[in-house]
């Protein structure tokens, strides 16, 4: 088929449509949507589209990762992560470092075996391990939501904090090791200084620029409210770029800036959250498709045996060992079952594949082998861990039903209103015990019925309104004082 502008748009539309339907199928069957997105990209790459530009894939990945990390930061609430802040930070820093070290040493040992078809020196082995040392919990929580599950012992916020904040550490390890290879060796002091500068500058820039974004959103008077989300999006990219120019970690800055915005009062919060959520999904799909198009399945199969051994080592030994060592100082605060579950949720996602493009673009010897191994292990992790998360949670007795949030009416109150909205469905038991009119409901002091939904009809509430089984009442009440 001749690739005209119209045909490119058509192919792009088909890719997005197929991906959306694949995501729906994945959600229904409790499988990671990422796995199907990658599969769609690989399928189109085999027959219809020729794409082999690692720099373009890296650029798409960087843009997508900025949006994903910022959105993840906005969803991270200080009140939820405060009890598990210490273990979460330890896992996202030392956990990544230990996983990279253990896996890198195993790859180096494996490279020395005569029967393997890869022979990587120590630093390159550590580089390979570093690219896939961070976790991706976004797919995990999509699975838990699809099966209406939650987690005990504050595991959910701890895993969210780890997954949102460990990408910067893996990125720094990857960049430093690439620089080490290209410069024929760097001193320990240089490596340590690079880490310190990236962390300090990244954290400071994220905090300050996050504060600036809040100030701009609340003080800048824009006539068209649709421009507020676009203003925030520009801040996301500005934060990443300016931090990188100052030799800081742009990904860390973006995540912290997202946390600042998400935990403070801002204008048009609902519109901004809706915009960012849709944009996050769009760029996740584009990123996964792009990475799926980039891989050559034939080259990936050539390293399948070695990649399988490395992947099994990471899942069974590398990740659990690093988790248990990192959580050792916290003693009985985190029980054994929780440690086992955290070890199992070492899910690899798109981020390792993005980081695997850095050695390719930098021209590191053996970069193609690194990319293919990382891609294979990502698929392996999604198939083995991604499809069994809910089963493992149930087996360990850590799953609980997910509490309902929001209401079925799609109504939200501004942050400044100190009230809660919730909906109640009328049952036969309610009618038998309280009565069949609205005035018989005997609602608590300070609670009012705003509207009644009966089928597709909305009714204005009054005391004499006869209630039917299945009616939904939208209630507004004062927030509980803590």
Q: How would you describe each model-predicted region?
A:
Residues 159, 403-412, 449-455:
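Short linear loop/turn motifs
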Residues 1-402, 406, 416, 429:
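Transmembrane helical cores of multi-pass secondary ion antiporters/exchangers
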Residues 192-193, 220, 398, 407-411, ...:
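Short flexible/disordered coil segments
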Residues 408-410, 422-423, 457-462:
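The feature marks cytosolic C-terminal regulatory regions of anion transporters and related permeases
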Residues 430-482:
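Cytosolic Rossmann-like ligand/nucleotide-binding regulatory domains
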Residues 418-426:
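Short glycine-/aliphatic-rich beta-strand segments at the starts of folded cytosolic domains
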């Amino acid at each position: 088929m001749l690739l005209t502008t119209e045909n490119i748009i058509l192919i792009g539309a088909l890719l997005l449509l197929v991906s959306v339907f694949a995501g729906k199928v994945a959600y229904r069957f409790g499988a990671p949507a990422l796995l199907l997105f990658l599969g769609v990209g690989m399928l189109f790459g085999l027959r219809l589209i020729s794409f082999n530009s690692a720099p373009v894939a890296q650029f798409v990945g960087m843009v997508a990762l900025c949006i994903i990390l910022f959105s993840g930061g906005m969803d991270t609430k200080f009140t939820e992560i405060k009890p598990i802040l210490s273990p979460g930070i330890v896992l996202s820093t030392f956990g990544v470092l230990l996983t990279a070290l253990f896996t890198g040493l195993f790859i180096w040992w494996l490279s020395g075996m005569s029967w393997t078809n890869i022979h990587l020196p120590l630093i390159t082995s550590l580089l390979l391990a570093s690219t896939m040392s961070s976790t991706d919990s976004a797919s995990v929580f999509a699975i838990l939501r699809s099966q209406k599950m939650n987690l005990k012992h504050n595991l959910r916020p701890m895993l969210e904090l780890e997954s949102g904040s460990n990408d910067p550490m893996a990125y720094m390890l990857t960049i430093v090791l690439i620089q080490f290879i290209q410069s024929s060796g760097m001193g320990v002091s240089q490596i340590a200084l690079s880490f310190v500068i990236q962390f300090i500058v990244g954290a400071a820039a994220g905090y300050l620029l996050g504060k600036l974004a809040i100030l701009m959103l609340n003080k800048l008077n824009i006539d068209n409210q649709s421009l507020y989300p676009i203003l925030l999006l520009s801040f996301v990219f500005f934060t990443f770029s300016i931090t990188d120019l100052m030799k800081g970690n742009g990904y860390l800055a973006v995540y912290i800036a997202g946390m600042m915005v998400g935990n403070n009062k801002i204008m048009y919060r609902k519109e901004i959250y809706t915009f960012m959520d849709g944009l996050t999904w769009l760029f996740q799909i584009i990123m996964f498709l792009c990475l799926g198009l980039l891989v050559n399945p034939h080259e990936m199969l050539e390293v399948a045996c070695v990649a399988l051994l490395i992947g099994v080592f990471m899942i069974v030994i590398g990740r659990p060992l690093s988790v248990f060592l990192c959580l050792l100082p916290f003693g009985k605060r985190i029980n054994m079952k929780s440690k086992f579950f955290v070890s199992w949720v070492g899910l690899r996602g798109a981020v390792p594949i993005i980081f695997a493009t850095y050695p390719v673009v930098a021209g590191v010897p053996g970069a193609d082998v690194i990319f293919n191994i990382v891609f294979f292990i990502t698929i392996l992790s999604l198939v083995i861990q991604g499809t069994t998360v809910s089963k493992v949670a149930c087996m360990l007795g850590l799953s609980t039903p997910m509490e309902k949030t929001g209401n079925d009416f799609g109504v939200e109150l501004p942050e400044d209103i100190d009230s809660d909205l919730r909906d109640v469905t009328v049952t036969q038991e309610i009618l038998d015990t309280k009565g069949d009119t609205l005035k018989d409901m005997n609602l608590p002091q300070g609670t009012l019925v705003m509207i009644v939904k009966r089928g597709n009809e909305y009714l204005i509430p009054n005391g004499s309104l006869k209630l039917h089984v299945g009616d939904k009442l939208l209630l507004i009440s004062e927030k509980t004082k803590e």
